[in-house]
């Protein structure tokens, strides 16, 4: 939902001037034809404590090379994650993550690898090792795109132009 339209400087860039982004990934454990285009159907039991532990661990790291696509043109794989948490909302398992930037495919890779830990296919220590290995081969699959949503993008106030007439952001 668009909550406002703002004027910006002519040299502003919607991607490069953003100071943070928030993503949400939704998972449903029962088949539902009304949700199949917007939620990842994942019929397996998961350990919420392990999911939360993995999500918490993500905030302690900045190098996400293990969750980057190969042969990308990014100059750095460093990202600062400020919020990372799983919850239940309307019978969906929901992952919310906020950071200053994200690599292409990073959230989907993180979700898939955390789900492996939550199913007992990886320990939390092994999950940490995947992150620290800085090798994208170790995070070998990603969750489908249809569960992922960009929820919010924040910009610093100096990017937004003030209305000279009203003295506030347009």
Feature annotation, model-predicted:
Residues 1-170:
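Structured-RNA-binding interfaces characteristic of tRNA pseudouridine synthases
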């Amino acid at each position: 939902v668009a909550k406002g339209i703002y004027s910006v400087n002519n040299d502003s860039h919607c991607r490069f001037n953003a100071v943070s982004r928030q993503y949400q990934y939704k998972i449903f454990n029962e088949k539902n034809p009304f949700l199949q285009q917007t939620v990842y159907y994942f019929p397996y039991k998961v350990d919420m404590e392990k999911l939360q532990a993995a999500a918490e661990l993500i905030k302690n790291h900045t190098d996400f090379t293990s969750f980057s696509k190969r042969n990308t043109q990014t100059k750095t794989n460093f990202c600062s994650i400020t919020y990372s948490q799983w919850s239940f909302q309307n019978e969906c398992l929901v992952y919310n993550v906020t950071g200053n930037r994200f690599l292409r495919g990073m959230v989907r890779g993180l979700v898939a690898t955390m789900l492996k830990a939550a199913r007992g296919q990886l320990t939390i220590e092994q999950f940490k090792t995947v992150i620290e290995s800085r090798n994208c081969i170790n995070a070998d699959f990603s969750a489908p795109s249809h569960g992922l949503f960009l929820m919010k993008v924040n910009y610093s106030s100096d990017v937004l132009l003030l209305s000279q007439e009203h003295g506030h952001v347009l």
